[in-house]
Swiss-Prot record:
The keyword ATP-binding applies. One of its GO terms (cellular component) is cytoplasm. GO terms for molecular function: ATP binding; phosphoribosylaminoimidazolesuccinocarboxamide synthase activity. InterPro entries: SAICAR_synt/ADE2_N, SAICAR_synthetase_CS. GO terms for biological process: 'de novo' IMP biosynthetic process. Belongs to the SAICAR synthetase family. Its EC number is 6.3.2.6. This is Phosphoribosylaminoimidazole-succinocarboxamide synthase. It holds the Pfam family SAICAR_synt.
Length: 313
């Protein structure tokens, strides 16, 4: 089997803390620096799956870095450097306790709720007669609370402000940033023959200033459809050809797993993991518009620790 990076346990210069998220390992250093390592872990339905996906961490880290650089004129972001294909180092910000999900089309969990009869999503009324994968007249923001453990919950703009999760002034600013980032992401995707269907952004504050943090426009935080054939598939009521993690979710559903108690995660064979890896690489090449350069997979953890340590010297 190809080597994958499941988890890191480094002792980095100036290290104060480490947090192992669903797919990232995040080290807090002195001087308000963060080291974010995109591992090859993969999660779906808020569960980390048992097998790693070769090159997934590199794909996520490099797509995010590409888009952070391409949107810096819209909003300041946390990224300072990428000393390794799987690592980003940046400013530690105090994250807002909400994630800004923005949708240009009705699909995924929003469609599942709509199909079950719900007509209000995060406080927003939805029109009757919508069909799966239909474009909204205007993109809609459907925020979620940010859960450290377990499931993120939908929440409305009014509730966020009323509960004091984010001040009204800050919320209005991150809302403006969210629309502007989605517009830029939509334009950049269109140039590559893709539709940015929906995505999520996270923001934080440092020294009173709002920053875009974490990853953006990656297959883990976004859905992309192929633009070619979208309309025909939509009119025929067929599934869209998409580049996202949705194909993993669909495979799990078909194999009887949706993250519910008592359900068993199906066995992920080496061939299956390789096929997921190929989808991620294809996504990188489509989204970034450049060939993917596979980093050496031997001694991954050693290489990463060396590159981080050399950068921090």
């Amino acid at each position: 089997m190809k080597e994958t990076l499941a988890r890191t346990d480094f002792r980095l210069p100036g290290q104060k803390a480490v947090y192992h998220g669903k797919v990232r390992d995040v080290y807090t250093l002195e001087n308000d620096l963060l080291v974010m390592i995109a591992t090859d872990r993969i999660s779906a339905f808020d569960v980390v799956l048992p097998a790693g996906i070769p090159y997934k961490g590199q794909v996520l880290n490099q797509i995010a870095a590409h888009y952070l650089d391409a949107t810096r004129d819209i909003v300041p972001n946390w990224k300072i450097a990428t000393p390794d294909p799987m690592v980003t180092i940046g400013h530690r910000c105090e994250p807002f306790k909400v994630e800004m999900v923005i949708r240009g089309y009705i699909t995924g969990s929003a469609w599942r709720a709509y199909a079950a009869g719900e007509r209000v999503l995060c406080g927003l009324p939805l029109p009757e007669g919508m069909r799966e994968n239909q474009r909204f007249e205007h993109p809609i923001i459907t925020p979620t609370t940010k859960a450290d453990e377990g499931h993120d919950e939908n929440i409305s703009r009014q509730e966020i402000i009323a509960q004091g999760l984010v001040s009204k002034e800050d919320y209005e600013q991150i809302e403006r940033y969210t629309y502007a980032l989605f517009e830029r992401g939509t334009q950049m995707a269109a140039e590559k023959g893709l539709i940015l269907v929906d995505t999520k952004y996270e923001f934080g504050k440092k020294d009173g200033k709002i920053y875009l943090i974490d990853e953006i426009h990656t297959p883990d935080s976004s859905r992309y459809f192929y633009a070619e054939g979208y309309q025909e598939r939509f009119e025929r009521g067929e599934a869209q050809k998409q580049l996202s993690k949705e194909f993993v979710r669909q495979w799990l559903i078909e194999n009887g797993f949706q993250g519910k108690p008592g359900q068993q995660i199906p066995k992920m064979t080496e061939a299956y993991c390789d096929s997921v890896s190929e989808r991620y690489i294809e996504l990188y090449e489509r989204v970034v518009g450049k060939p993917f350069e596979k980093a050496d997979l031997s001694n991954l953890a050693e290489r990463i620790e060396k590159n981080i340590t050399e950068y921090l010297r």
